[in-house]
């Protein structure tokens, strides 16, 4: 994981606003959105709609944060990583460019 200078750290509320914005675009509504330190993952999505993001994401570039956010939000529609999931992920991220 890369470290950004302290002045580049995104505030937690800004990050959560990014999650809400992407959720509206994708058409999903997470039950809960949390940030906490995680040792081995960038994020996780529970079967009950709880999204948990690694606090280290706050130090990452916006494009990478978007990839992780979209990935987890899409799990609210598609619970696996098969072809339909990957196609949706590519389509959503292509909207960003």
Predicted regions and their residues:
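Active-site-proximal or metal-binding-adjacent scaffold patches in catalytic folds
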Residues: 1-67, 76-97
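Walker B catalytic acidic pair
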Residues: 72
